[in-house]
């Protein structure tokens, strides 16, 4: 077991919150390093997100009520952080970034099992940083920033080449 702090409607580890599933089509919120020594995973702190209740009809005479965190426009979103888990050391480390990104819609390991790429975005989703984070030194650098007047579309086409370049 990698984490022990998960709690319904408070902390989610390695799975997505409602916003990430709907906005970014992200369900599995972890990635194994190519050498199998590390896992990078998302931690969603939903504790400040307001709850929403919905009636579910499951075949009975009366509905059951499901209560879950559901941020409406302009309200608090989950605070998202990325962690490295080192299997040999049995230790998780928070990946420090220069900015507190509102969204981190994608993570992907490079061919180097110590380097993780991540996309960091602002709330309006019109500014994206492409960041490389080092699992061993817990340092990172922004390789480039993309800005748009309206919206930046997220894709899964990032491919790392053997020489650490990418397309």
What positions do the PLM features span?
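Predominantly five- to eight-bladed beta-propeller fold
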Residues: 2-30, 41-94
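Beta-propeller and related beta-repeat scaffolds in trafficking/envelope systems
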Residues: 9, 73-75, 145-158, 162
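Surface loop/turn motifs at the tips and blade-to-blade linkers of beta-strand repeat domains
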Residues: 20-22, 96-100, 144-150
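Blade-terminus and WD-like Trp-Asp/Gly-His loop motifs, strongest in beta-propeller folds
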Residues: 24, 29-38, 106-116, 157-166
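Beta-rich catalytic cores
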Residues: 26-28, 78, 103-105, 126, ...
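Short glycine/acidic-enriched loop and turn motifs that connect beta-strands
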Residues: 46-49, 122-126
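Beta-propeller blade signature
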Residues: 80-87, 130-138
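Long hydrophobic segments that form regular secondary structure
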Residues: 86-122, 136
